[in-house]
Each structure stands twice: as C-alpha cells, then as structure tokens.
C-alpha cells in the first residue's frame, strides 16, 4: 500500500518535471531550434494540423529555421500561421522552402523571458508540493484506518519528502540551465 502511494507520487512528480522541460523548450532563446515552432498549427483540409505533420522543420544555422512544406499549396498558410503566432517571427518564402530568421533578443526581452521561465518553474514546484500533500493525506487515511502504524507513516512521509526534494532539485537544475541559455548573448 505504501509502495503504491510512493510509486504514484514518484510518477506524478516525474511528469511535472517533464512537463516543465517541454514548456521551457518552447521559450525562444537566441538559438534556432525546431521545437520553437512545435506549438503552431496550420489549417489543412479544414482541420488545424500541427506544423510538423505538414512540413519538415530543421535548424539551418544558429539563427535560421528552414521549413520544407510537403504540399506546395500550404506554403502561404504555413507562413501566415507563423506570422500569426505570438513568437514575433517573420518568415520568408523561397518556393517550397520557408526560411525563418530569428532576430537577436534584446536585453529587456531576455529578462522578461527569464521572469516567464521562473514562473513556469514555480508552477512546477507547486505541483510537486501538491503531489506530496496528496500522498501524505493518503498515508493519513491509511493511518486513520489502522492499516499502517505511526512509525510506518512517519517513515513513508520521510520517503515522500525525499522524492519531493529530488523533484524540486531537478526543477531548479532545468530552470538554471534555461536561464543560462536565455542570458547568453
């Protein structure tokens, strides 16, 4: 019973850390990376379709993304979708290849992005703490129903606290790496 609670808490904490990594990969740094456009959808046969399903996105160099559209008809729609996104990018079309130059980030924009990234990290820390609280309340329920002893409860709570500390440390490491990446000029 205690092992199930610990395992569930561990899985949920790992998912929180992965979700943070995924969210932070979409935050624009000075470098071109295909995941930057992963949140963009294109109207294709009347349905919004993720960009990576209608085109191939690669980093041409450190400051340019190259998008090869599979269907020539979609080139303008892809360009429009990129312009309409809130990424502040200006695509240039050359046949079926669309090049997206990334403008250098200003110091002010970098600081804004760091604030956003810190907010995301704090949200993940809160999620991890909520998972800890849920696991501890499950343990209290077992203790109340006399399915575990007080010693087992205390030991299990210590184990959950260790899991929480590890998850928060991972979040802090991800945050520090992203902040460093953002502040590089």
Swiss-Prot record:
It is found in: Cytoplasm. GO terms for molecular function: ribosomal large subunit binding. Pfam families: RRF. InterPro entries: Ribosome_recyc_fac, Ribosome_recyc_fac_dom, RRF_sf. One of its GO terms (cellular component) is cytosol. GO terms for biological process: cytoplasmic translational termination. Keywords: Cytoplasm, Protein biosynthesis. Its main location: cytoplasm. The keyword Protein biosynthesis applies. Responsible for the release of ribosomes from messenger RNA at the termination of protein biosynthesis. May increase the efficiency of translation by recycling ribosomes from one round of translation to another. Belongs to the RRF family. This is Ribosome-recycling factor. It comes from Vibrio campbellii (strain ATCC BAA-1116). The lineage of its organism: Bacteria, Pseudomonadati, Pseudomonadota, Gammaproteobacteria, Vibrionales.
């Amino acid at each position: 019973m205690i092992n199930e609670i610990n395992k569930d808490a561990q899985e949920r904490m790992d998912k929180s850390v992965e979700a943070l990594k995924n969210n932070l990969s979409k935050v624009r740094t000075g470098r071109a990376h295909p995941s930057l456009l992963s949140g963009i959808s294109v109207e294709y046969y009347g349905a919004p379709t993720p960009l990576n399903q209608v085109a191939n996105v690669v980093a041409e160099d450190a400051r340019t993304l190259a998008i090869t559209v599979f269907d020539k008809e979609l080139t303008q729609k892809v360009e429009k979708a990129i312009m309409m996104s809130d990424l502040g990018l200006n695509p240039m079309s050359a046949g079926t290849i669309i090049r997206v130059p990334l403008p250098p980030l200003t110091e002010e924009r970098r600081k804004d992005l760091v604030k956003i990234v810190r907010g995301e990290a704090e949200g993940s820390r809160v999620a991890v703490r909520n998972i800890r609280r849920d696991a501890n309340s499950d343990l209290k329920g077992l203790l109340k129903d006399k399915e575990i002893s007080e010693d087992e409860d205390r030991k299990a709570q210590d184990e959950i606290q260790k899991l929480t500390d590890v998850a928060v440390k991972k979040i802090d490491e991800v945050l520090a790496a992203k902040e460093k990446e953002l502040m590089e000029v």
